Amino acid sequence: MIDGHTKLAGVMGWPVEHSRSPLMHNHWCRVNGVNGAYVPLPTHPHGFDQALRGLAAAGFQGVNVTIPHKEAAMLACDELTPTAKRAGAVNTICFVAGRIIGDCTDGTGFCDNLSAHDVAIAGRAMVLGAGGAARAVAAALLDRGCEVVIANRTLERAEALVEALGGGEAVAWYEWPSLLSGCSLLVNATSMGMGGKAGLDWDAALREAAPGLCVTDIVYTPRETPLLLAAQARGLRTVDGLGMLVHQARAGFRAWFGVDPQADRTTFDLLAASLRTDA
């Protein structure tokens, strides 16, 4: 029951109806005995800054921001964590003593998901894409000592990302399949595969993959994307994107509600059931 002591948080996006974050955070509030609520906050881009400051004034603990607000959120924040600065985007905001503090938990969530599956974060990683998610993932991998190769359909964007990160290597899109023989990790950080649309002949792209390659996708709708299915058919290890969603959310929940939630089977089962309902 919501009362005068309920701590409030939410997710700002446009659209935001698809977000599983309210389901997950409210589940964590229930199982941890937290007097809190997490709500969807559909926010038009033209009103983002005003809405963000209004939520801070209304007593919210903080918010997540999703498409298309992650970069706009950087400009609206009074302070950015070093991780957010490096990632070039914000997905988690805390309202502290009248200040808006932005963080990016995508990279940490991605790596925590790999670790939860006992995947070693080492060696050479091929990252597909040069957008906000790719930057967060690439930064986290570089900071953990990986060699990172970034492939993007527009080479200039990959080159700009490498320059911004101060590390890694940019390659043309057509080159990346031939480089997989020397990689231990392949990350799809693009929207290809969302909704089950392949967007690419993944089986052909994986022909040069080393037997020990781990293939992971940030897309989680569906959980088994065309890339992951193609990798499984070749006997490669795969990690789906749902765990990244769960692990990146934990830092925000900790900051807003003061409890460290568990990325347990119940949480995953709840989210998986929701995804099946919408399929």
UniProtKB/Swiss-Prot annotation:
- Give the reaction(s) catalysed: shikimate + NADP(+) = 3-dehydroshikimate + NADPH + H(+)
Q: Where does shikimate bind?
A: S19, R20, S21, T66, N91, D106, Y220
Give the Enzyme Commission number: 1.1.1.25
Q: Which InterPro entries match?
A: Aminoacid_DH-like_N_sf, NAD(P)-bd_dom_sf, SDH_C, Shikimate_DH, Shikimate_DH-bd_N, Shikimate_DH_fam, Shikm_DH/Glu-tRNA_Rdtase
- Name a GO CC annotation attached to this entry: cytosol
Pathway(s) of this molecule:
Metabolic intermediate biosynthesis; chorismate biosynthesis; chorismate from D-erythrose 4-phosphate and phosphoenolpyruvate: step 4/7
Annotated GO molecular function terms are: NADP binding; shikimate 3-dehydrogenase (NADP+) activity
UniProt keyword annotations, A-Z: Amino-acid biosynthesis, Aromatic amino acid biosynthesis, NADP, Oxidoreductase
The active site lies at: K70
Binding positions for NADP(+)? G129, A130, G131, G132, A133, N152, R153, T154, L155, E156, R157, I218, G241
Q: Can the keyword Electron transport be found in this entry's annotation? A: no
Q: Which GO terms describe its biological process?
A: amino acid biosynthetic process; aromatic amino acid family biosynthetic process; chorismate biosynthetic process; shikimate metabolic process
Entry-linked NCBIfam families = aroE, PRK00258.1-4
What HAMAP family does UniProt report for this protein, alphabetically? Shikimate_DH_AroE
Oligomeric and partner information = Homodimer.
Q: What does this protein do?
A: Involved in the biosynthesis of the chorismate, which leads to the biosynthesis of aromatic amino acids. Catalyzes the reversible NADPH linked reduction of 3-dehydroshikimate (DHSA) to yield shikimate (SA).
List the protein's name.
Answer: Shikimate dehydrogenase (NADP(+))
Please name the source species. Answer: Gluconobacter oxydans (strain 621H) (Gluconobacter suboxydans)
Its gene is aroE
